[in-house]
């Protein structure tokens, strides 16, 4: 039998996970998100694949001159408190993004108003990484890829990026 405190923790984690899974992805194409700038892409593995909510699609760079910078926009300034990243895709694992940074801006990303939200290293498995942050507002998001799982990779790849807010449900 589980101690009461562990049982309570399991129940809380289950409900939070269930609620997060049902949270709307604010940056997805279905929600009006757009890919607005990128340093490179290799057709058909284009930048918008990262926000299309289809795990089988992904982005691949044309070459591996780092950093790769991918910029996305929401239809309007929105509140968010969770970010999700998936590097794993059908491309070679050594190409999967390793060191990334995500920044947000509103209203003028071209005027240097970027605020770094997260600077992190993704695991070699490429599995989904969800991070919770203090609630913020933003309209533009910049994903920078500084390294791949193997520094000798000839290209970089990334699967999915999500921006979520539990209060919007």
Please identify what each model-predicted range represents.
Residues 144-152:
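Short beta-strand-plus-loop segments that form exposed binding edges in beta-rich domains
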């Amino acid at each position: 039998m589980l101690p009461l405190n562990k049982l309570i923790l399991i129940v809380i984690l289950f409900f939070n996970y269930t609620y997060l899974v049902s949270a709307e992805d604010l940056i997805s194409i279905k929600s009006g998100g757009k890919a607005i700038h990128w340093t490179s892409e290799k057709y058909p593995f284009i930048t918008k694949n990262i926000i299309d909510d289809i795990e089988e699609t992904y982005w691949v760079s044309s070459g591996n001159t780092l950093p790769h910078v991918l910029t996305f926009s929401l239809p309007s300034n929105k509140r968010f408190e969770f970010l999700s990243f998936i590097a794993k895709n059908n491309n070679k694992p050594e190409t999967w993004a390793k060191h990334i940074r995500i920044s947000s801006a509103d209203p003028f990303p071209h005027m240097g108003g970027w605020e770094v939200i997260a600077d992190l290293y993704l695991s070699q498995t490429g599995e989904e990484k969800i991070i919770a942050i203090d609630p913020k507002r933003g309209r533009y998001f910049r994903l920078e890829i500084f390294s791949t799982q193997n520094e000798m990779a000839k290209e970089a790849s990334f699967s999915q990026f999500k921006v979520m807010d539990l209060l919007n449900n």
